[in-house]
């Protein structure tokens, strides 16, 4: 019988939530998930806990840094957590923090109520043993592109029944992640700007396929943002179907559609800079 061994391991704390009051009319909600990977065989295999901090301590460091950060700097908070934890645990090899940040603003005319702004900002920071920090941004949004996307000239076999389409509706979930070359001046605002630029690029680039569309969108983002060295984009597309109205005195004129939620088409591309 072959012997068994521990191959990989990690542990951490998920969904640690705080609200920071940044002013009379502005609060910031931050949700953190913290993970540490390392050589913790003694903990997993032998049950010796002297190598690790309790995960409650992860939460305490996050809350302490969030409360002391000037202007709720996401980079300062995330990297601060990683620095503290990895310096305390000599067997830690890689640390990562995912932060989801949402601004809340007070409703006009109501001194007691606040409402969450959209969108939330999703970022992550990863630190290795060399202290180097890798920063990434994320976005996920359901979008509709009403025209400008064709699909024709594709290969056919005996079971291909799809017709060429000169212009179609694209409706589905757009997801993207990108990696920063360095530290953005304002990580919150930078993520919002990249996401808006991505959506604008996806909607404006004419294309002969969804695959070409997501590549062009990624290339346009990299061309506009020199501080990003790669972006990965995926799109899960739902089918759409024109609704034929039963009333004899009314016509659709391509204004009324329904979504077909299954099956879902998927496309993915990673766009990088040449070395």
Residue ranges and their predicted role:
Residues 1-275:
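N-terminal intrinsically disordered, cationic/polar leader segments
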């Amino acid at each position: 019988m072959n012997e068994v061994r521990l191959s990989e391991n990690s542990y951490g704390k998920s969904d640690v939530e705080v609200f920071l009051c940044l002013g009379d009319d502005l609060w910031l909600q931050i949700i953190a998930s913290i993970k540490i990977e390392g050589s913790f065989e003694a903990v997993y295999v032998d049950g010796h806990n002297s190598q690790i901090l309790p995960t409650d301590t992860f939460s305490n460091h996050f809350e302490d840094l969030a409360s002391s950060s000037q202007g709720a700097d996401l980079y300062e908070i995330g990297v601060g957590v990683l620095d503290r934890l990895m310096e305390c645990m000599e067997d830690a090899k890689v640390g990562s923090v995912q932060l989801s940040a949402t601004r809340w603003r007070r409703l006009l005319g109501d001194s007691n109520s606040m409402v969450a702004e959209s969108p939330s900002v999703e970022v992550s920071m990863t630190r290795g043993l060399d202290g180097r920090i890798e920063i990434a941004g994320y976005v996920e949004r359901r979008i509709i592109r009403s025209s400008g996307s064709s699909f024709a000239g594709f290969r056919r076999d005996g079971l291909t029944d799809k017709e060429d389409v000169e212009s179609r509706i694209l409706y589905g979930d757009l997801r993207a992640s990108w990696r920063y070359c360095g530290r953005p001046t304002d990580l919150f605002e930078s993520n919002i700007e990249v996401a808006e630029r991505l959506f604008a690029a996806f909607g404006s680039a004419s294309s002969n396929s969804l695959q070409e569309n997501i590549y062009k969108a990624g290339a346009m983002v990299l061309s506009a943002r020199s501080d990003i060295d790669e972006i990965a984009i995926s799109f899960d597309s739902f089918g759409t179907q024109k609704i034929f109205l039963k009333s004899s005195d009314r016509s659709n004129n391509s204004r009324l559609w329904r979504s077909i939620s299954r099956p879902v088409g998927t496309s993915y591309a990673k766009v990088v800079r040449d070395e």
